[in-house]
Amino acid sequence: MTQVMTPKTIVHELERHIIGQNDAKKAVAIALRNRWRRMQLDDEMRQEVTPKNILMIGPTGVGKTEIARRLAKLADAPFIKVEATKFTEVGYVGKDVESIIRDLVETAVKMKREEAKQKVTEKAAILAEDRILDVLIPPARASESKVGFANEPAEDAQSKKEKENKTREIFRKKIQNGELNDKEIEIEVSVAPKSIGVMGPPGMEDMTNQLQDLFSSLSSDKKKTKKMRIKDAIKLVKDEEAAKLINEEDIKARALESVEQNGIVFLDEIDKVCKKSGTSGADVSREGVQRDLLPLVEGSTVSTKYGMIKTDHILFIASGAFHVAKPSDLIPELQGRLPIRVELKSLEIEDFVRILKEPDCSILKQYIALMKTEGVELSFEEDAIRKIAEISFQVNEEVENIGARRLHTVMERLLEEISFDAPDLENKSINITTDYINEKLSGLVKNKNLSQYIL
């Protein structure tokens, strides 16, 4: 998708879901477009051009994670979001940073497998229908004499075959139209391998995964006759037939290439592994993790169960609130490998108003759609929308600034009664006004002690 998307187009797509933060949008748009530019270069130059990694700096709830999430859908590339705080220095109990790349490869393999299945879905559907039809209408066999010759003339056998084919086509149409969905049949299907838990030493997750795969593969060829509805059988058999049609080795090779050339890693909470200024002493979860991240970000080779992965051209986007620590508290080597700095701004009342109204699936649109399932027509006056934004901003200022996430808290509290009573309401048309908001929320906002716990 990024091959035909210019930076402006990428920013426009992001603006459909994220309000403001244009600097961050531009930075990721350029980084994404540079992927395509690099692929247009000759081989020698292509190897030299490495991605410019990004550091996003901004308070919680301003859109850092959302930009990454939307970018993943847009990029059509292997993408993984991880929290830096989940990892420990090599040698200590916990996950080591190389598991990031292993998880990224797993994501890529799943993506490529789904792509391959989509390509063979029509053929798999026909083969699945054939297997169902074989159960419904078993193929007729020519009656044989004791010496092994067919008793009936060739013309009769031919007409019987044609009649059988016509019957099969009639039933095939019925299956396709869903007329036989609830009919139960007995069909032989592959048995899903049992999941076997393997306890492994810390830092040896890759070996543990390989052992699990080995045990699973030992029972992968087993078959079992099951009784199920045709609707369920079609889905199960279609997946089986699709798996037979795709080339697993080709999928693995393409997944490895996709990770090396197009992989994106989003490292959240990077500020939590900074060593705070003026402190001293050993800290397992901090500086050691940064030093372990260095080789990945700079470019190294990581062993995975699918093969070796070079991380030279994987794009790393790090983000953090940096409330306590500062970007300069990162070790100098890691700072140098995150050359693009983007600062995301705190949200104002106007931003909250836009977040409530403008995105394709804005918060207000979500609540209106949810209530519609109960037959309730929910609407909001313009003044009421601004009031919600003002209350959210005020609580952020007075209690704790959690950014746009505060809107969800306020909306849940505001619509709690309506949501609870929705199935039994006689008046199915509800208009939210400033008076209604004042009635439900003003007391809580004024009482700081209450708002700390409720909003």
UniProtKB/Swiss-Prot annotation:
Membrane-spanning segments:
none
Q: Give residues annotated as binding ATP.
A: I19, G61, V62, G63, K64, T65, E66, D268, E333, R405
UniProt cross-references to InterPro entries, sorted A to Z: AAA+_ATPase (IPR003593), ATP-dep_Clp_protease_ClpX (IPR050052), ATPase_AAA_core (IPR003959), Clp_ATPase_C (IPR019489), HslU (IPR004491), P-loop_NTPase (IPR027417)
- Molecular function in Gene Ontology: ATP binding; ATP hydrolysis activity; peptidase activity; proteasome-activating activity
Please give the family membership noted in the entry: Belongs to the ClpX chaperone family. HslU subfamily.
Summarize the protein's role. Answer: ATPase subunit of a proteasome-like degradation complex; this subunit has chaperone activity. The binding of ATP and its subsequent hydrolysis by HslU are essential for unfolding of protein substrates subsequently hydrolyzed by HslV. HslU recognizes the N-terminal part of its protein substrates and unfolds these before they are guided to HslV for hydrolysis.
> What name does the UniProt record give this protein?
ATP-dependent protease ATPase subunit HslU
Query: Which organism is this protein's natural source?
Result: Francisella philomiragia subsp. philomiragia (strain ATCC 25017 / CCUG 19701 / FSC 153 / O#319-036)
